[in-house]
């Protein structure tokens, strides 16, 4: 059964609230001009390189982008439920240097190739959201599929409408267009709206975020320590005792899952034993009734 809302997704809830709150703060404080990046003049000649570290953390400059980003973050909550909040937070933090630094650096390189027309990088956590979208695309299966079919029929009107059915059916010829969609299609539609909101500036962080997410999943993204994880206390979890071996770390990592599976196994065994007990009791009652019927017949004889 699907869980509604943001249940069991505290990091996604925090990301959603931060996206909306930071976008509102940009408007209230009237500091939108400090959030985005223009290669000229912000980086050259003003040398405002601090924008490379703040453009993704500043929020969005208009309500449309903030709305689509919040909707996309809400759809991506299933990734946190599948991974757990510790791995989810680790992914965001470990990919943050790449999603923050690569888009402006690529913008600097692409600017001369586009005859200095590509000069603007919109602010907001677009790259992080699309890195999460890559995990959603690769790791979350669809629940259902549906088809949308359209048809354009051209029928030839007959001179006499009282003719037989064979004469009327000859003119009916149709062209069909069928689209096969799934429950994940709405998520991709929201992501496309966000990527195309400030074309072509928003396309760059969206593409970089997707590539970073795919590279992280393929384990080709250079990270300082592949075994590093966010501390358990940072996400509200308790640190389990370490056993000092690799197997001990694996047991610590999946301790919660093991306890959950054990609880489900105990509940299933109890239900099975209850069903078996009720079935044996019912069979005993039927046997006693059968024996009682035989004794009554013998007494009648």
Curated annotation (Swiss-Prot):
Q: What happens when the gene is disrupted?
A: Impairs growth on solid media under hypoxia and leads to triazole susceptibility. Impairs virulence in a murine model of invasive pulmonary aspergillosis (IPA).
Membrane in keyword set: yes
Known EC number(s)? 2.3.2.27
TM spans, by residue?
A: 9-29, 52-72, 90-110
- A GO molecular-function term, please? transferase activity
Where are the stretches annotated Disordered? 268-301
Q: Could you tell me which SUPFAM superfamilies the record lists for this protein?
A: Rhomboid-like
**Compositionally biased spans, kind Low complexity:** 268-284
Which keywords, in A-to-Z order, does the entry hold?
A: Endoplasmic reticulum, Membrane, Transferase, Transmembrane, Transmembrane helix, Ubl conjugation pathway
Q: How does it assemble?
A: Component of the DSC E3 ubiquitin ligase complex composed of dscA, dscB, dscC and dscD.
Q: What does this protein do?
A: Component of the DSC E3 ubiquitin ligase complex which is required for the srbA transcriptional activator proteolytic cleavage to release the soluble transcription factor from the membrane in low oxygen or sterol conditions. Required for growth during hypoxia and triazole drug susceptibility, as well as for virulence in a murine model of invasive pulmonary aspergillosis (IPA).
Designated name of the protein: DSC E3 ubiquitin ligase complex subunit B
Which organism encodes this protein? Aspergillus fumigatus (strain ATCC MYA-4609 / CBS 101355 / FGSC A1100 / Af293)
């Amino acid at each position: 059964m699907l869980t509604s809302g943001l249940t069991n997704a505290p990091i996604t809830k925090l990301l959603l609230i931060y996206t909306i709150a930071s976008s509102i703060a940009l408007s209230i404080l009237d500091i939108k001009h400090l959030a985005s990046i223009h290669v000229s003049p912000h980086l050259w000649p003003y040398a405002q390189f601090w924008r490379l570290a703040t453009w993704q953390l500043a929020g969005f400059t208009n309500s449309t982008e903030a709305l689509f980003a919040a909707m996309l973050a809400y759809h991506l909550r299933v990734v946190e439920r599948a991974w757990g909040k510790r791995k989810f937070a680790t992914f965001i933090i470990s990919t943050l240097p790449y999603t923050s630094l690569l888009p402006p650096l690529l913008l600097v390189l692409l600017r001369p190739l586009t005859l200095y027309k590509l000069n603007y990088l919109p602010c907001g956590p677009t790259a992080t959201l699309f890195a999460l979208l890559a995990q959603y695309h690769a790791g979350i299966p669809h629940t259902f599929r549906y088809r949308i079919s359209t048809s354009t029929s051209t029928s030839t009107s007959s001179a006499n409408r009282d003719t037989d059915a064979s004469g009327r059916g000859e003119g009916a010829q149709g062209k069909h267009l069928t689209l096969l969609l799934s429950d994940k299609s709405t998520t991709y539609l929201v992501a496309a709206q966000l990527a195309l909101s400030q074309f072509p500036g928003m396309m760059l962080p969206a593409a970089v975020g997707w590539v970073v997410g795919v590279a992280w999943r393929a384990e080709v993204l250079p990270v300082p320590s592949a075994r590093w994880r966010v501390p358990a206390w940072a996400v509200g979890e308790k640190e389990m005792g370490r056993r000092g071996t690799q197997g001990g770390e694996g047991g610590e990592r999946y301790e919660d899952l093991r306890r959950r599976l054990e609880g489900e196994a105990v509940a299933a065994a109890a239900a099975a034993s209850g069903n078996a007990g009720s079935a044996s009791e019912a069979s005993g009652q039927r046997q006693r009734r059968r024996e009682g019927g035989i004794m009554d017949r013998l007494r009648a004889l």
